[in-house]
Amino acid sequence: MKQLLPIGVLALVLAGCGAAPERQTPSDELRDETPEVVAEREWQRRASSGRETEGEALPPVLRDGTLYIADRRGRVSAYKAESGRLVWRFGTGEAVSGGPGVDDDLVVVGTRKGRVRAFESPDGEQRWEARTSGEVLSVPAVGENYVIVRGNDGRVYGFDRDSGSRRWVHDVSVPSLSLRGNGDPLLANGQVMVGFENGRLQALGVDGGELRWDVTVSEPRGSADLDRVRDVDANPVLFGGALYVVGYRGNVMAINPANGQVYWDRELSSHAGLAVDDERTYVTDDRGRIWALDRRTGAAIWRQNDTEGLQPTAPTVHGDRIVFGDNRGRLTVLSAQDGRILARIRVREDVTISEAPVSDGNGVHVLTDDGYLMRYRLRDRNDD
């Protein structure tokens, strides 16, 4: 049985070092300056059943102006991102642990018992069901011909999109001790990119699951099992012709997605994840600090230290700002240019925000672990 790394251990892990201008301000309880950004809540909905046994919300997915939410009790819902209007909701009849993966007319979820279930959108009629050998903790990737599913035991499955028949399986040996959770498979340009608990990122052919290339993101350190944990759990990001990835106790890298060539790499440990814009790569490290790196070289531009210890989510790019949630139920807004804190918004009391906010370019959507989904519009205070 897979063992789980206690969350308290994460606070003891040091991220990679590097020179960068540091932004440091007092905690929100002590700050008395006026925030530079004002957040207006446009709507709020009770979108999911909220915290259950292991606690975290499942990530919301934005597609074509609609937000898709699954909860661990098996409900799947769709909301209009701008208005918050409920478009549809249906029950899967089973505890959901991964998803939803969404395409034009298909919603796919994974379950704790290793089932993959595909439903018609919007009526919720089940199209097919397939089996994997273990719990599904990531979001299935839904493509034109295939649904790609990452199992919790190192296997990656390619299922026929229309029938659910298994076309291929790729098996990777993974260590028994790792972080709980898996990065989502990324489907693009005829291949699927997947990170594993052994510290490697692989690209597989989407038609047959054959290995295209393999890159080491995180190397094992020390002799004790705990010291050798090295998961690649953060979701890879494809941007501007490069693939960006970061590993726990490893590196942040820019990779050529065609052949696995490493453009640049930098020692930096993260399990939360990263985001990318035209100029910079933003990373939440394992101490909770937020970094901005030059997208083309990996050179450090700034680092915000005031978030240390708050378990911030992966960053999300929202125009010229960076937004993320934390374990105090807050949405924090940073300047993308220099990392200064523009605002901290109390979303809800005594809750955690485990999943990164979702931006549609106009509004920022936040899902709390107790199941509340809300949309904020951000504006400069001097626009009043």
Task: Say what each PLM segment does.
Residues 71, 111, 151-152, 196-197, ...:
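Structural signature of WD-repeat beta-propellers
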Residues 2-8:
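Sec-dependent signal peptide recognition
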Residues 21-28, 34-61, 88-103, 126-143, ...:
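Extracytoplasmic beta-rich repeat domains
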Residues 14-16:
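C-terminal motif of bacterial Sec signal peptides marking the signal peptidase cleavage site
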Residues 283-291, 299-333:
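Loop/turn-rich, solvent-exposed surfaces of beta-rich toroidal or solenoidal domains
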Residues 80-83, 120-123, 160-164, 206-209, ...:
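Short loop/turn segments that connect beta-strands within beta-propeller blades
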